[in-house]
Structure formats: C-alpha cells, structure tokens
C-alpha cells in the first residue's frame, strides 16, 4: 500500500464523501463527530467473551473521537459552546435524540435501531450500528447529528415512528392540554398576599404592569414577578389593576407551553420565517420552546446571531429534508410557519 500526504481541504473532501455528507464547515464537523461517536461506541461495546453489548464510559468515547479527529480539527478539544458544541455536548445531544442510551455513572450503550418518518420517502435513522456497517443497498446520508435513509429500507426491519410520536408533545394537542392546566390551576386559587405589586401580566405576547391593563373587570391572566433574579410564574385573578387571587405554576416548561396557547387564543401567534437556500433552511427563534419540542432543534445546528442581539434570540440551520419534522413540532404549538423560498416562487 502506498501512503501519500494530502492537504486538510482534500482530507475534508474525502471525509465528506465517506460520510455521504453534502455540508461543509460546522455541518460537516458535527456530522463527523456524531458518526465517529457511533462507530467508537459500536467498536468498544463488542465483547470477545460475552454476547451482550458492554457499556462504554464517556471518557473513553470522547478521548477516542478526539484522537481520531484532531488532525482535521486541531482545536477540537477546546471547542464547546452553543454555536460550536464540543464532543461531550454532541454525545449528550445524541442521547436526547434517542440515538444512544445514557446510563448512570457516565456509561453508554447503543440504542435499538428505529426511524422517524419524514415524508413518504425519507426517514431519520436512530440507534443501531454506524453507517459503515449497513448492508449493501442501504444508503445513509450524514446530516449533522442524524442520518437520513429511504423509508423503504426501514419497513419491516426497524420500528418506524411518526414525527409527533417521536416529539412526544401532549397527544391531546396544546389547546386541550392548556385548557386542563388552566382549569386545574384556577380551582386552587387562594387570596393573593399584599406584597405582589410588582406583578406583570401576559397580554398578547407582552408582559404588562397591572397599571397598564385596560380592563377593570375581573379577569384571569398568566402573571410573573421577579424574585431573587428569577421569575416566579402564577395564574392571577386581577380586578381594577389589583391581584386578588392566585395559584402558582411550578413548571417553567408548562409556562412556555401555555404561552404559545395564549398567543394563539389572542390571535397573535409567534411567526417563524424559514429561508431556504442551497438545501439548507435557516430560521430565527425569538422564544424558547417547551422541552419536548426543543429536541427538534438538534436535528440541525446553531449559527451566530447579530451583534448586540438579545441573548434569548437563537439562529438555527437545518437540512431541508428534515423540515417536515421541525414544522410538525412548531405547528403543534400554534407557531405560524412562513416559507420565504415558497413565497418568492409564488410571486
């Protein structure tokens, strides 16, 4: 065998071809780290003496991936932030997606193979073995943390989930879930203490001080007040600018989900503009999603925002093929999806 040196750019091209990955820069790096983690976990979990798969520690996984990829990304051990996640962050996100199983004590196992249906043709493949071990005829495309395959190769061989089933949002829908939360919380109302003058109420997507409310009659609002640099959330009955009765909402995740319902109810839903170009979809998110829906953001990756932009605003990139799953999560919350690529072609 003849060995020859190649440039870093050439090596990245070869890696992109091997992974069947059409992205460069951060898309390629995350694809490479993800597939390398799958490969190392598969390799290290096989025992020569036992039939069952063995657990592998986080340290062993991340160290092996770092050694393999440091020639291409010399600073890979030092990278770890929201825009450029490190090896351990990517490993944890694979567990959130269901691609691997995280056990107590920092141990890992391969997840049973399963797929999530995108449309009538493609699916996202989770769990199982690395792509290099797939049988002949199964073509996997690396797309960031995930792999895309034709749905027909999964039929009859692995369990196929619908997008909403995988997302795991309340099956009854956000309207019914929120209505039940509201009625249950209101039934536990108690008289409000006198020291709640800093309460703000959520009205049509904005937090308003009680003195700014235009209605004097009794009305129920989602409320919050800052306590020790954190917000405390509650439902409040307000009359003539005064909080009369209230009941706490303990889960901030419930509050996020409820806000989307209230926006839809008040006819001011959050609108997301999707810009599609060269097979990539970009969006700007101005609010945090509930925990279950948040995992769809891991189907893509982050981009830097603009200078002096609010820290709560995030920018996301997705392979265009994955958009139906992302859209399903957003529309389940009542978010209005505006496809700017489609709009331009309709003009």
Curated annotation (Swiss-Prot):
Main location: cytoplasm
A single cellular component GO annotation: cytoplasm
Annotated transmembrane regions: none
Cell compartments where the protein resides: Cytoplasm
Effects seen without this gene: When this gene is missing the Druantia system does not confer resistance to SECphi27 in E.coli.
Keywords carried by this UniProt record: Antiviral defense, Cytoplasm
UniProt record, GO biological process: defense response to virus
The keyword Transmembrane helix is assigned to this record: no
UniProt keyword Cytoplasm present: yes
Function: Component of antiviral defense system Druantia type I, composed of DruA, DruB, DruC, DruD and DruE. Expression of Druantia in E.coli (strain MG1655) confers resistance to phage lambda, SECphi18, SECphi27 and T4.
Annotated protein name in UniProt: Druantia protein DruD
Name of the gene encoding the protein in the UniProt record: druD
